[in-house]
Amino acid sequence: FCLDLEEHNGSYELDSWQPETTIADLIQATGGPSLPADEPLYCDNRPVTASSTLAEVKPMEGMRISRAPLSYPSLVQGWSVCLSGGSTVTLPHPIPSSRPLVAGRSPYADIVLPTASASWEHLHLQVVHDESTNTQKVRITDPGSTNGSFVDGQKIPEEGLTVSESTTIHVGDCVLTLQPAPQEKAAPRPGSAPNVSTSGTAPFNRPPRQGALSAPDKVEAPTRKNVSDPPKFNIAMAVGPIIMAAAMVAIMQEIRYALFAMLSPILSIGMWVEQKRRHAKDKVKERVRFEQEMEKFKERIALSNREEIERLHDLAPAPDAVQLRALLPAMTLWRRRSTSPDLLTFHVGTGHIHWAPELTKPSNPEPEVQHILEHNTLWDAPLVADLREGGAIGIVGPREQSLALARSLVLQAATHTGPADMTIAVCADSARSQDWVWMSWLPHMHMAQNQQMRWFASGKEQSDQMLRSLYNDIESLPTRGLCVVVDSDTLTEGRESPARDLLAYGDEVRLMANKTAAAGARRVAGIVLASSVDRLPASCTSIVEIG
């Protein structure tokens, strides 16, 4: 539990207590001040007094005792904006219709952009009503920022841009996400029902999970129809009757035969001209048809792009969405089980990805189709690190930014998957371990054999011992998933490094001859922070270099 008083604060483990013990007794036992019996306090957001007994309070794991209630975020009804990328993320902020919402570097902005690449007043957002569709949309305007603002890779024009669906905006080094409606549904908060267990936990009922979004359907590419060339002019059919007529005139001495003979070449020439004209008309008609089909093809590609970005967001939600799930808490909390196909998939950033949908007939596409597929780009799409088969994410860069990304990855692991399906362990150099003390609050860190112990090690000797223990006894872990954080330049050095062995466990699983055993084996994912790329272990399947 946590004490958050002005004159006394800290984190403590409560091993045992008597039912008649009061909150005042508990605070005094930690070395805190003696409080009057009637002093109002809060256990999380529940009002109590210093004289309230623990039997009445029913202490919960992670409880916070303070003079102010713990605030929970609320879902924004209607359009909202949040920082979803960069070194900081925020909770959703409502977009007003009465005035423009200001995003910029100014400390007085509605959304403060923590980057030097943003202008003092960089972006304006305002909800507007569309009379033609009777819907609410958002007007995006750039009041003359230095570096501009970008949507789908295009700079927002001077006259602004109106959007009607979820939109990602690049503003300097930051990413803003606009949402037309809340994407989450709040679950009952722990302690809101009389179901607190003797161990200080409350049951969390996961509703049935909807199926994962499937990949976009295959796209039918347009093909040109073959317009047959007109037959070549037949000289024999035109000249033959003339020669025959000349012979008949010479033999029969009758000029009328010449007049009849002339009809045949006239008909031949007329038919040839008509076929040429029809061929030209068919070519124009086919060209127009193909151009129209290409426009429809581009629309289908754009729809597939939106569907694929939506699928990637579902597979790897952005840090702001993950944070909201944890703080609400949301019904989507801990929805990934050990058998889920998206176990151990992580959102590492936002970027532009070359991607093309599958074609119904992939062989020999038209050159125009091939050009579109080769240059198709998913703008502002989630960058996904897939560690379902093992491996690690290596992070290299400035300490502050590297820690921010690593914390984001840990938050994702702890939010997507519950402690019944995922164990999280941390090993760090002694000088870096203080940056990870906060993780001891995660239930995923508890050792099954001793709930008072955590999978946390500081220094090389202690870390090597814990990592070797995890590697040797990995199949006896109560959870199928294991996420290991290694914050060190020395723990992954040497051929005898237990950290290397543990992070490479996925390779051992893939080489198992018994496929049934491999399917039920533990899944190990790593998050490794290092000072340079050459210090990362070979098991890193994704590397993030922060400039």
Name every feature range the model reports, one short phrase each.
Residues 1-19, 25-36, 46, 52, ...:
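Accessory regions of macromolecular translocation/handling assemblies
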Residues 40-41:
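Major-groove recognition helix of helix-turn-helix-like DNA-binding domains
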Residues 57-60:
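Long, compositionally biased intrinsically disordered regions
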Residues 64-66:
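Intrinsically disordered, low-complexity Pro/Gly/Ser/Thr-rich segments with frequent PxxP/GP/PP motifs
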